Amino acid sequence: MLGSLIVNFKLFSAGGAIMEVFSRSFKNGEEIPKVYTCDGKDISPHIGWEDVPEGTKSFVLIMDDPDAPIGTFTHWVVYDIPSQTRELLEDFPKVPEVSGIKQGINDFGRVGYGGPCPPRGHGYHRYFFKVFALSVESLGLPPGASRKDVELKMNGKILAQAHIIGLYKRD
């Protein structure tokens, strides 16, 4: 089974700390509950992170599905998350900006979270929730930026990254 191949990815920072991503909504390598998908309420799950490296000034979160038939599909882009923030709560608002935290456009063409919605009968897809610790307070992008623009601005500023993986399929 796909779940047995999945490990929690951690990256050592220069200071030796291990940044870790977790969720109270699902366990790493296990199925994402229906409420967080297009078959449910399509609300975002809780995502948290800990053991961030010294010097972290902001975070970026990117959720994607590398198993989509059209290539990697971006479900969520969140950036300029303040350094003191250690989680995004369940049902994070689908608006361009919340208390300085900005959200980009997903591949559904909308701002904010777009839950798992793989083609029926396509089997399990893996959904990566990636958190990046950055050395800058802001990427200098307006709300509604593309993933590509966010990744270009992150280049050379990543102190650490980690992710968890959730699974989902539609029969």
UniProtKB/Swiss-Prot annotation:
Q: Which residues form the signal peptide?
A: none
User: What InterPro entries does its record include?
Assistant: PEBP, PEBP-like_sf, YbhB_YbcL/LppC-like
NCBIfam families named among the record's database cross-references = YbhB/YbcL family Raf kinase inhibitor-like protein (TIGR00481)
PANTHER family the UniProt entry points to: PEBP (PHOSPHATIDYLETHANOLAMINE-BINDING PROTEIN) FAMILY PROTEIN, UNCHARACTERIZED PROTEIN YBCL-RELATED
Family, according to the entry, reads as follows: Belongs to the UPF0098 family.
Q: What is this protein called?
A: UPF0098 protein aq_1250
Annotated source species: Aquifex aeolicus (strain VF5)
